[in-house]
Design a protein with these regions (language model features):
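Extended alpha-helical coiled-coil "stalk/arm" regions
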Residues: 161-222
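Soluble oligomerization/assembly scaffold segments of membrane-associated complexes
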Residues: 91-177
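Bacterial Sec-dependent N-terminal signal peptides
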Residues: 1-25
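Long, charged amphipathic alpha-helices with heptad-repeat/coiled-coil character
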Residues: 169, 215, 221-250, 257
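N-terminal, leucine/charged-rich tether regions that mediate assembly and partner docking
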Residues: 19-115
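Sec-dependent signal peptide cleavage junction
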Residues: 17-37, 44, 129, 133-134, ...
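Soluble non-cytosolic domains of exported or imported proteins
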Residues: 41-45, 122, 142, 251
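Structured segments of extracytoplasmic/periplasmic soluble domains
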Residues: 50-61, 134-138, 142, 182, ...
């Protein structure tokens, strides 16, 4: 089931990754503002980090105004000498669609506080649409890289657990061989002790008592060895089952990791 959900997410993300920016409206302090917007198939926190990294890589420091992420003096169009303060609103699409985020970009006149009068004209809004489109690759690239990091961490964790199980398997096999050897030697010692008891004189009560005491000890050891062997063999059987399960989990997780890497490569 997890595999199919993961594949469905890849297909769904692929569809959304082709989405273009669009004109929308954003309500702030009971006023509706025209904004450029784009929808991306990633959680809000990841998208927020992606926007920050994108803008920082271009030399723009982040600021905050109310719920807006603000970057000052941003040239939204390379062919326009003007620059605007870029007000970003980054929110999840809905409570039922937490892995889809809407990025809204509102261009505000440089250095002015957000009010209806400070909003740039319609040409800046067109530039804002293009600016969001230019960010699409970075949004998807950054988000997929974060997924790859998380998935790689999961794969490494599974590999670590598999290594522990493998080492445990070796230790258990070694203990089983050791106790099988002890049990085989114990059997020989009991046979030898039986012969010694049979050859002893009936009148040698002291010698017989010691011989029987030694035999009792050998039989107690036999019981102990057999119990430990049963336990270790049961542990080894469980270990083998766990290793099979972990191998299956690893194969699935590693396939998901490779799928993510392919998605990243396909973006380029």
């Amino acid at each position: 089931m997890r595999k199919w959900i993961f594949l469905a997410l890849i297909l769904f993300s692929g569809i959304l990754s082709k989405a273009q920016s669009f004109n929308s409206h954003l309500t702030f302090q009971k006023t509706s503002y025209p904004v450029a917007a784009i929808q991306v198939p990633y959680p809000e926190d990841v998208v927020t980090s992606a926007v920050k990294e994108y803008m920082l890589s271009r030399g723009f420091a982040e600021a905050h105004y109310k719920d807006f992420l603000v970057f000052r003096s941003v040239p939204l169009d390379a062919g326009d000498s003007r620059s605007s303060d870029a007000y970003f609103s980054i929110v999840q699409k809905s409570h039922s669609e937490k892995d889809i985020t809407i990025i809204s970009l509102l261009p505000v006149k440089k250095g002015e506080t957000l009010t209806p009068a400070s909003v740039e004209d319609s040409s800046s809004l067109r530039f804002a649409l293009s600016y969001l489109d230019s960010m699409r690759y970075h949004m998807h690239s950054y988000s997929i890289k974060q997924q790859i990091l998380a998935q790689q961490k999961l794969v490494d964790k599974i590999k670590s657990k598999m290594l522990v199980l493998k080492n445990d398997s070796g230790d258990l096999a070694k203990k089983i061989r050791s106790y099988e050897s002890e049990l085989a030697q114990n059997k020989k010692d009991q046979e030898k002790q039986t012969r010694e008891i049979s050859s002893m004189s009936v009148g040698d009560e002291s010698g017989l008592a010691k011989a029987h005491k030694k035999m009792d000890k050998l039989m107690d050891d036999q019981t102990d060895y057999e119990k430990k062997l049963r336990n270790y063999k049961a542990e080894l059987e469980k270990n083998t089952e766990d290793r099979t399960t972990e191998q299956s989990i690893f194969d699935t997780a590693n396939s998901q990791l490779e799928a993510l890497k392919k998605r990243l490569a396909d973006l380029k």
